[in-house]
């Protein structure tokens, strides 16, 4: 028996011991490995085991119960577990010594190894060090990952790398780190045990102590809330200021503007009425004696007369009877004194041939129309002296829409006194409806 256990007393014992050792490490290692697997019962991971494994005693603190967390509905997630493969010799040797080792977990916050504590994973060690985990560890070691030897860190490496992340719990409130006595809220949602697949479907490991940066600024009680109108006050005020600079000048719509568009003529902007126009007819009697002057032409101005062309069409009958006779088309220049202003106007009097007839016009009247502010419907009057044959021009504004052509008569206090200077009296002729 001593020879069989490895004694060196006899050659036969040495041969049997060497042969048994060769059976374990040589050609019989495959059969030996499967016998060990058959001898290990399949563990059932219960709820309390999952809780202990999520939060080992003294290593990871439970999150704070005061943190508001929305409950998540259970959705089964299945993870493909790698199949068993041929293991190196050092893994078989370490698998036999698993009961002699202690687990060391690294805290994710400071990456410092925790002290050796009594093992709380006796029921999970056969599962964590089985062929599925070893094959996964071997694959990870070939990829030059941090955990090259997965025996002490097999479960942590498998859970953090192979398990699906929970998209809800990404970070915890800082009180989860400071409160070690808080009740755990990570529990399995299963009412019944589901065997080995309980780990791969319901077990969840969250990196609770790794702070996830937020793209939004922190909100505090001292933060002020602004409305959209308050935020956009600056640009809106600037735009209003720019628009106000443009719109400061008032827009005045005149009657001649709309009427000139109908006749396809340029705009005629009337000038302001001079202060001398507010004088009564008594001032005019000083310059003109109504006994000497008489009205030879009256016309109600049209759109073309007050247009920018500066031309007034004269009534044919009155023009041929009282104005100078025209022998040439080019016409003649006529000087007329202003009835209200101390100025003299130079107009060109000419005619146009029109179907074997003539149309008489008075040109260069734009300045006179602007000076008196004449518009469509106003009255244009020409006086002629019976003694000197001087011409006097007058423009009168229409007082009412239904009043046309004021009648200008000579008014004297004493008609029998011929030496008395008489003034002009205006009487309105109402339009017949």
From Swiss-Prot:
The keyword Nucleus belongs to this UniProt entry's keyword annotation: yes
GO-annotated molecular function: DNA binding; DNA-binding transcription factor activity
Biased composition (Polar residues): 269-283
GO cellular component, as recorded: nucleus
Amino acid composition bias (Basic and acidic residues), ranges on this chain: 13-24, 237-265
DNA-binding region as annotated in the record: 297-399
Composition bias type Low complexity, residue spans: 216-229
Coiled coil: none
Stretches for region Disordered: 1-29, 216-283
Superkingdom of the source species: Eukaryota
Protein name listed in UniProt: B3 domain-containing protein Os04g0676600
Originating organism: Oryza sativa subsp. japonica
């Amino acid at each position: 028996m001593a020879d069989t256990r490895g004694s060196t007393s006899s050659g036969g014992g040495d041969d049997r011991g060497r042969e048994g050792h060769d059976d374990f490490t040589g050609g019989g290692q495959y059969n030996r490995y499967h016998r060990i697997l058959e001898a290990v019962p399949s563990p059932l991971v219960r709820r309390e085991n999952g809780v202990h494994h999520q939060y080992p005693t003294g290593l990871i603190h439970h999150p704070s119960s005061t943190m508001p967390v929305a409950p998540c509905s259970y959705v089964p997630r299945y993870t493909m577990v790698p199949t068993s493969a041929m293991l190196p010799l050092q893994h078989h040797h370490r698998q036999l010594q698993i009961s002699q080792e202690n687990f060391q977990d690294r805290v994710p916050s400071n990456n410092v190894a925790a002290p050796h504590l009594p093992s709380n994973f006796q029921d999970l060690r056969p599962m964590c060090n089985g062929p599925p985990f070893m094959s996964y560890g071997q694959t990870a070691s070939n990829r030059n990952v941090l955990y090259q030897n997965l025996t002490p860190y097999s479960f942590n490496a498998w859970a953090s790398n192979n398990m699906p992340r929970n998209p809800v719990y990404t970070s915890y409130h800082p009180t989860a780190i400071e409160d070690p006595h808080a009740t755990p809220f990570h529990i399995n949602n299963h009412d019944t045990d589901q065997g080995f697949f309980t780990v791969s479907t319901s077990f969840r490991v969250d990196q609770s102590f790794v702070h996830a940066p937020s793209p939004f600024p922190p909100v505090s009680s001292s933060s002020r809330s602004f409305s959209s109108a308050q935020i956009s006050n600056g640009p809106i005020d600037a735009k209003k200021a720019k628009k106000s600079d443009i719109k400061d000048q008032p827009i005045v719509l005149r009657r001649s503007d709309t009427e000139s568009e109908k006749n396809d003529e340029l705009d005629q902007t009337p000038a302001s009425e001079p202060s001398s126009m507010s004088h009564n007819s008594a001032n005019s009697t000083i310059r003109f004696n109504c006994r000497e002057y008489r009205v030879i032409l009256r016309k109600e101005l049209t759109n073309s007369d007050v247009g920018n062309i500066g031309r007034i069409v004269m009534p044919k009958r009155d023009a041929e009877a009282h104005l100078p006779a025209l022998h040439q088309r080019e016409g003649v220049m006529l000087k007329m004194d202003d009835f209200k202003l101390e100025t003299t106007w130079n107009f060109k009097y000419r005619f146009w041939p029109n179907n074997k007839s003539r149309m008489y016009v008075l040109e260069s009247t734009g300045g006179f129309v602007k000076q008196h502010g004449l518009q469509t419907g106003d009255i244009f009057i020409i006086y002629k002296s019976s003694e000197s044959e001087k011409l006097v021009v007058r423009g009168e504004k229409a007082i009412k829409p239904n009043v046309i052509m004021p009648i200008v008569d000579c008014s004297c206090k004493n008609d029998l006194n011929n030496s008395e200077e008489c003034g002009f009296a205006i009487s309105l002729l109402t339009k017949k409806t």
